[in-house]
């Protein structure tokens, strides 16, 4: 499985990004119970063909929107691409608001099954309790749970049901690479804007702090970082005002990590000629499109801290469809550089927007993480801050 994921990650990322620019306006909506919204892609209504094991695929999101140009959409493009290639009907289901409950998420699973899905991709760690219920309620349904681990499902023992496959990533490694590269490229006043303080976002952020610190030590310089969780996965006037204050106060680059919250950071960066680091997928295209449309004066994206969402989802679906579920049943695949090229920065020329940081420098630090010479703390507890040197000052804001 690890070998297959390594081979498919780049292809899945390319497929995902090619489609990410499309609008969700072609998707029709219908109301569902318990204050949830179920939506179905109109292009996916054809009869299922060529599949003996998957009769229907559903993606259920824990929070946020589908067109976040990041986590939810990265998974969805893999689901959509798989359905289109295989002739399998696919749908997605969203909670109606950021305050959705476990019962709301159970309702989404219930409706997905009622609509014919026998394979459900649940994205976001908040799906843990709903998965504990759903796996028992629907023992013949396969669940692929992205950014969910066993303790999200079973807080006492961490047991993963046999019809669930959990996929997690070593986001701290991607965050480390982003922070290291930013400082090596000359940035000394950094920012981290997280969505909610959930495990994956925390790992990205703490890795970013550690990488920036390591580069500062190598260069013998001091760097400063503002650090803040917006408490949401979307941008709005409040978050934009916060980012305006940062950039106006001298912040040079912000790692925006949390679904659609990047829009506020990008808006503020454009006003103050600041820079941005994307997350989950290569978000450089958003800056390019923004310039072409006149939305931005210049492309704000320096790089993106990525993880192989599309590869993980596609691999899980392939495994179900091939009748090989037993090879991943009840397990948690945790993917980083030791396991393959599952996290990193985009290295294609179009997305490499560094001024002085070189590809050789990137490959050197990447291999040191891969072989264990550099160990990145993977703490995902917001109360436990990473250990740093005197070369970095982090202002953890609330």
What role is predicted for each listed range?
Residues 16-19:
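C-terminal motif of bacterial Sec signal peptides marking the signal peptidase cleavage site
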Residues 21-23:
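Bacterial signal peptide processing site
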Residues 26-37, 41-398:
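A residue-level marker of the well-folded mature domains of exported/periplasmic proteins
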């Amino acid at each position: 499985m690890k070998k297959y994921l390594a081979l498919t990650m780049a292809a899945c990322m390319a497929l995902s990004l090619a489609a990410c620019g499309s609008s969700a306006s072609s998707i029709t909506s219908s109301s569902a119970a318990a204050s949830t919204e179920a939506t179905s892609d109109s292009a996916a209504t054809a009869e299922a063909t060529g599949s003996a094991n998957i009769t229907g695929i559903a993606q259920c999101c824990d929070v946020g929107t589908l067109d976040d140009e990041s986590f939810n959409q990265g998974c969805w493009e893999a689901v959509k691409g798989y359905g289109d290639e295989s002739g399998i009907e696919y749908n997605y289901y969203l909670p109606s608001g950021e305050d959705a409950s476990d019962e709301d998420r159970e309702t989404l699973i219930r409706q997905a099954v009622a609509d014919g899905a026998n394979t459900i991709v649940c994205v976001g760690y908040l799906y843990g309790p709903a998965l504990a219920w759903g796996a028992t309620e629907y023992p013949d349904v396969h669940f692929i749970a992205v950014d969910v681990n066993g303790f999200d499902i079973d807080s006492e023992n961490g047991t993963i049901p046999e019809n669930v496959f959990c996929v997690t990533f070593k986001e701290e490694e991607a965050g480390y690479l982003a922070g290291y590269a930013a400082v090596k490229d000359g940035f000394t006043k950094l920012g981290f804007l997280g969505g909610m303080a959930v495990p994956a976002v925390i790992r990205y952020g703490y890795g970013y702090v550690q990488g920036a610190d390591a580069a500062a030590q190598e260069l013998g310089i001091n760097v400063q970082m503002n650090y803040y969780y917006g408490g949401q996965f979307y941008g709005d006037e409040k978050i934009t005002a916060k980012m305006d204050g940062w950039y106006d106060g001298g912040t040079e680059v912000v790692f925006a990590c949390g679904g659609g919250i990047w829009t506020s950071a990008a808006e503020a960066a454009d006003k103050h000629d600041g820079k941005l680091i994307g997350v989950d997928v290569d978000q450089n295209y958003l800056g390019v499109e923004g310039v072409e449309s006149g939305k931005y004066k210049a492309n704000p994206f320096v790089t993106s801290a990525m993880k192989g969402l599309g590869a993980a989802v596609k691999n899980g679906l392939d495994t179900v469809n091939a009748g090989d579920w037993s090879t991943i049943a009840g397990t948690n695949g945790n993917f980083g550089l030791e396991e393959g090229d599952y996290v990193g920065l985009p290295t294609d020329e179009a997305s490499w927007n560094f001024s002085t940081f070189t590809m050789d420098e990137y490959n050197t630090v990447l291999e040191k993480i891969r072989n264990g010479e550099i160990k990145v703390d993977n703490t995902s507890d917001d109360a436990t801050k990473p250990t740093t040197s005197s070369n970095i000052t982090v202002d953890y804001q609330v």
